[in-house]
Amino acid sequence: MSAIRATNLSKRYGGTTAVSDLSFDVEPGQVTGFLGPNGAGKSTTMRMILGLDRPSGGSVLVDGRPYGELRHPLRKVGALLDAKAVHGGRSAYNHLLAIAQSNGIPAGRVNEVLDAVGLREVARRRVGGFSLGMSQRLGIAAALLGDPEILIFDEPVNGLDPDGILWIRTFMRKLAAEGRTVFVSSHLMSEMAQTADHLIVIGKGRLIADTSVQEFIGRSSQGYVRIRSPRLAEVAELVKVGELYPDHLRVTAMNTLEIGTLTARAGIPLEELTFVQPSLEAAYMELTKDSLEFSS
């Protein structure tokens, strides 16, 4: 059984449709990246999963039932939607203790999750003085309090420095390796390429792709050979295929050996002859170009 299942999920706010007929499954034991341009409906979808917004149509189930019907929701699902949605005057320890006590979770679990996210030494400090990275760690600690099987993170690496991003990436991979379900939204394609096993991509509230990372990249984009030369126009005329840019030529129909042989025979010097691998970012931009809320 899928950990999360959305079926024909829709959400309308007045005359605006935020999510439209969206169906997907999120499976355990892997990190599933949830991608889409600003305004695509990612946060709205996560809120419906967690019972914070009521769907206008369709349904979404968590472990086979609506979130509101879970007997002990925090023991089944942990979520981080807004790292700063915390009372700034409370200490990290007291913030977590209040959540634990209101959900029937033993107080001893607070120190366990503080240790897990590396905040034990600052547990008595007021949250209002925390950096964004520390706040993100505290939010993850709160999500882990009930030792849940399913974790939902909305943009957990936004605004973090490289060390913070690396920590969250490693931590999410660890959670998935334990057999948990990790469902995470992000705008950082390079990060998702290193973190996610599977991708669900939406645009304007509709499903665009539901596939593995490698299948997504291979299906949506292809590699190319990048050529730089002081005689670039001659190279373009020689190969007769490719896209000519001001400072380089892109060729997809020939490999580096073929191009190198041709240009050597013609006596044309090359400054660069490189095969550029397809990337998640390039595939994402190609697939979502018609779903951008704003574009230049």
Q: Which residue ranges define each predicted feature?
A:
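ABC transporter nucleotide-binding domains
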Residues: S2-A6, K11-V184, M189-G203, A209
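Small side chains
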Residues: A6, G33, G242, G260-T263
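Solvent-exposed beta-strand sheet faces enriched in polar/charged residues
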Residues: T7, R228, T274-V276
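Residues at or immediately flanking beta-strands
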Residues: S59, Y224, P269-E272
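Alpha-helix C-terminal capping segments
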Residues: Y67-G68, L74, I99-G104, I227, ...
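A generic structural signal for secondary-structure junctions
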Residues: Q101-G104, V213, G218-S221, K240, ...
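ABC transporter nucleotide-binding domain
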Residues: R169-M254
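C-terminal coupling/interaction segments
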Residues: N255-S296
